[in-house]
């Protein structure tokens, strides 16, 4: 099991839309993540900075950040690109966050 955290950047004024889209996450995306070993995945929003903090666990070495070649992921990126800071391929700009403390 591996834990990973990273931050992403939400464009101002799109908080409710971001929540709405994730409340209706595509079943095929959820299945692909789960089949890929991603679980216990949460995203938190800092309303003062519009930074999104994501935390996830994986059963293997691959995380959601390694699944960008999958067409389902690419379609999701395109769907979310208008409300997030993105790279030229529409992947969200992400910055890995090193773990500095953990308690079971």
Swiss-Prot record:
This is L-rhamnose mutarotase. One of its GO terms (cellular component) is cytoplasm. SUPFAM superfamilies: Dimeric alpha+beta barrel. Its main location: cytoplasm. Substrate binds at residues 18, 41, 76-77. The active site is at residue 22. InterPro entries: Dimeric_a/b-barrel (IPR011008), L-rhamnose_mutarotase (IPR013448), Rham/fucose_mutarotase (IPR008000). Involved in the anomeric conversion of L-rhamnose. It comes from Phocaeicola vulgatus (strain ATCC 8482 / DSM 1447 / JCM 5826 / CCUG 4940 / NBRC 14291 / NCTC 11154) (Bacteroides vulgatus). Belongs to the rhamnose mutarotase family. Pfam families: rhaM. It is found in: Cytoplasm.
